[in-house]
Amino acid sequence: MALHQSHLSVDELMQVVFFMLRSNGDAYLLISIYEEENFIKAASLVGLKNKRYQAIYDNERKLIRYVLHLRKDSIHLDTREETFIIRDSKNEYTEQFVDALKDFYLHL
């Protein structure tokens, strides 16, 4: 379901997520900050409960993405919002970023 814009509209993507998601399942979507309202509206229209799970920053001041948490029920939606910062003030990767990607990259 990655790169939905190539094949599916936001509305169609939410319909597919709803159809494929188990009643106790979780879906996490990495979305642009500019698309958040569209995703939240589309999720609500198909009956998915949603919560912004994580805000992703390129650096300490530049918000670039959100991780949206979707479920069929709202019982297990986490109420806290996490922050994830890729680069620090020295433009070096943060420990958080390195730790998250260490299994995928050899030299960070």
State what each model feature region is.
Residues 1-16:
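Mobile active-site "lid"/loop adjacent to the S-adenosyl-L-methionine
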Residues 40, 62-63:
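Short Asp/Glu-rich motifs
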